């Protein structure tokens, strides 16, 4: 059910060093690195932890860099959950779409309390 959890950080290099060392104890390793985010885990098919500089580059705090992602079996399933969340009172924080070509499709909402959620499909 959980795809990945994102934690906002202020120093990505320091966070990568810390989590690489810590998560190695559980068989974790760096799986994907991009300019402002790094994903750790055992494989892309299992739950992951990501650390990132918040998208708006403001200071990280709960709700600004933190997000829970729910992996789905298809792009259509991710989009359906996005629309269900909107119908239940969530607000759009990123319309459904391919974010990384042939690798990641995501749809983002904020729940009624402002918590950021993602419904995604890897592929």
Feature roles, as predicted:
Residues 1, 61-65, 101:
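Short glycine-enriched loop/turn motifs at secondary-structure junctions
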Residues 1-16, 68, 123:
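N-terminal beta-strand motif that seeds the catalytic metal site of vicinal oxygen chelate
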Residues 7-49:
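Core segments of cupin and vicinal oxygen chelate
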Residues 20-22, 81-86:
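Short amphipathic alpha-helices in soluble, non-transmembrane regions
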Residues 38, 66, 103-107:
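Short beta-strand micro-motifs in enzyme catalytic cores
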Residues 41-82:
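Long, continuous compositionally biased terminal/linker segments
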Residues 83-123:
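Vicinal oxygen chelate
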């Amino acid at each position: 059910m959980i795809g990945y959890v994102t934690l906002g950080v202020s120093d990505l290099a320091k966070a990568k060093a810390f989590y690489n060392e810590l998560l190695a104890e559980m068989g974790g390793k760096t799986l994907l690195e991009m300019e402002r985010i790094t994903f750790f885990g055992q494989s892309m098919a299992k739950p992951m932890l990501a650390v990132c500089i918040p998208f708006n580059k403001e200071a990280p705090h709960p709700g600004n860099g933190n997000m829970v992602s729910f992996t789905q079996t298809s792009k259509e399933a991710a989009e359906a959950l996005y629309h269900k969340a909107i119908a239940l009172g969530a607000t759009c924080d990123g319309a459904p779409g391919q974010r990384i070509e042939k690798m990641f499709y995501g749809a983002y909402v904020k729940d009624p309390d402002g918590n950021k959620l993602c419904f995604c499909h890897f592929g």
